[in-house]
Amino acid sequence: MATERYVVAARLKPGKRAEAERELEAGPPFDPAELGLTGHAAYLTDDEVYLVFEGKAARSTALRLAQERLTDVARWQGMVSGLPARVAEVPPGARRLYDWRR
C-alpha cells in the first residue's frame, strides 16, 4: 500500500486563533508513531486550521482518531465552526506550528 497524504481544514470561530495556536504548538494528544503514521503536521492561518496526516492508512487513521478521541474533538468544537473538510493542500501562507516525521 502506498503512502497516503490526508489534509483536513476547519474554519476558526472569531477570537479563537490564539487558543488554537496554543493547542497546535503543544502537539497532538496522541503518538503518531504508535498509530503507524510517517508524518503529522499542523498549520494555522488567520481563520483556518489545517492538519496533515501521512502514512499507509492516513485517512482511516484520521477518521478513527475523530471517533475515538471525543474529549479532544469536543475541545476543538469550541474553537472551530462546523465540521472539518478534506482539502487538497495546505495554502502557501499557512504557518506551520507542529511537524513530526518518522
Label the model's feature ranges:
Residues 34, 41-46:
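A short beta-turn/loop motif at secondary-structure boundaries
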Residues 1-4, 43-45:
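Short, flexible turn/loop "capping" segments at secondary-structure junctions
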Residues 2-14:
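Short glycine-/aliphatic-rich beta-strand segments at the starts of folded cytosolic domains
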Residues 30-38, 55-91:
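An amphipathic, aromatic/His-enriched active-site/gating alpha helix that lines ligand/cofactor pockets
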Residues 12-38:
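Short amphipathic alpha-helical segments
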Residues 92-102:
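Short, charged, intrinsically disordered terminal tails
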Residues 49-50:
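Hydrophobic residues embedded in beta-strands of well-ordered beta-sheets
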